[in-house]
Amino acid sequence: MNFTGAHILSIQQFQREDINRIFDVADAMEPYALRRRVTRVLEGAILGNMFFEPSTRTRVSFGAAFNLLGGNVRETTGFESSSLTKGESLFDTARVLSGYSDVICMRHPAAGSVAEFAEGSRVPVINGGDGPNEHPTQALLDLYTIRKELRSKGRGIDDLRIAMIGDLKHGRTVHSLCKLLGLFNNVSITLVSPKELAMPDYIVEDLRQAGHKVTITDDLPTSITHIDIAYSTRIQEERFASKEEADSYRGRFRLNQAIYTQFCEPNTVIMHPLPRDSRAEANELDNDLNTNPNLAIFRQADNGVLVRMALFALVLDVADQVDKYAREVRWFSSLRAN
C-alpha cells in the first residue's frame, strides 16, 4: 500500500506487510511518546479533529499524536456546532474543511459516513469510528498491543488464541480486529456473548473461510480456560432502543480476579478498548483486576498514541524524517522518568 496521501477508512485496505510497516514506524515513535525526545517534523501542519459522536480517548489520542510530531490541532465536536444541522452534506463539509487542514480525523454515528466524507476531501481522512461499522485505528492499536504483549512472552500473533467477550454485535472495535486477525495464520477466536449480541454472521464466515477456528458460546468460564488474550467489550448502551434493554445484559459476562484465577492461564492478557464501565452491576472488567500485571488496558491506550503517530507520519510522508527534526527534551517528565 502507498500510504502517502491515502485515506485510512477500513481495515480491509491493509495487507500483512502494511501492518508490519505501521508497527515498525510505531516502534520508532516511542522515544517521542515517552518525552525522551521532541520533533518538529509536522511543524505548521494542521489536523482537523472532527468528532460528531462522544469521544474522550480517541479524540485526545489523535490530538496528542499530532502534537507530538510538532503539528497543530483544530477541534470540532458535536452536530450542534456544525453546519450539518443546516442540511449541509458531508461532501460539501469535507470540500470546505479540507481546505483548512492537512489531514482530518473524523468520527460519525452513521456507518459509511466517514467514507462519504472522504469523497469530498482534498486531504487524507482517517476514520475515528463510523457508528457500528469500523474503528480501524482502534483495531490497529489492539493488534499492536497483542504483538507487544506476546513478544514479551516470546510469542507472535500467528497461532493466537483469543476470546472476545460482551457486546459483539454493536462493538465496532471487535469487528475491525477480527478483520485484521484474518490476515494471520491459525488464529483461534472464541466469541462470548448472548445470541442477541452476537458477532455479525458475515465476519464469522469470513474468518472461517480464511481457515481460522471460530467458536461461539455464551459461557464465560469455559471460554477463557485456554486463551492468550481475553478481550472484553462494554455494552453499547447508546445503540439500544432503551436503557432498560441495555441494562438487561449487564453483569452476565463480567470478568474479575476470582474468575481469572480460577479459569485463565497465568499469562493470559486482559484487554479492553475503553471506556470500561466500572460499576458493580456492569458487564466488563472488575476493578479488582487493576493490580493484575496482565491487565493491559492502560498499556493498550498508550499504544494508541504510537500507532496514530505512525499513521500521521506515513500518510504525510515524513516517517523517515522524524529523527532529522528532533532534539533532546529540556523539561522534567514523569513519563520519561518511568
From Swiss-Prot:
Enzyme Commission no: 2.1.3.2
UniProt enzyme class: transferase
Pathway(s) this gene product operates in, as recorded in its UniProt entry: Pyrimidine metabolism; UMP biosynthesis via de novo pathway; (S)-dihydroorotate from bicarbonate: step 2/3
Catalytic activity: carbamoyl phosphate + L-aspartate = N-carbamoyl-L-aspartate + phosphate + H(+)
Entry coiled-coil feature ranges: none
Keyword ATP-binding part of the UniProt annotation: no
Paired cysteines (S-S): none
Keyword entries, A-Z: Pyrimidine biosynthesis, Transferase
The UniProt record lists the keyword RNA-binding: no
GO MF term list: amino acid binding; aspartate carbamoyltransferase activity
Function per UniProt: Catalyzes the condensation of carbamoyl phosphate and aspartate to form carbamoyl aspartate and inorganic phosphate, the committed step in the de novo pyrimidine nucleotide biosynthesis pathway.
Family, per entry: Belongs to the aspartate/ornithine carbamoyltransferase superfamily. ATCase family.
PANTHER family recorded: ASPARTATE CARBAMOYLTRANSFERASE (PTHR45753:SF6), ORNITHINE CARBAMOYLTRANSFERASE, MITOCHONDRIAL (PTHR45753)
Known partners and oligomeric status: Heterododecamer (2C3:3R2) of six catalytic PyrB chains organized as two trimers (C3), and six regulatory PyrI chains organized as three dimers (R2).
Stated name of the protein: Aspartate carbamoyltransferase catalytic subunit
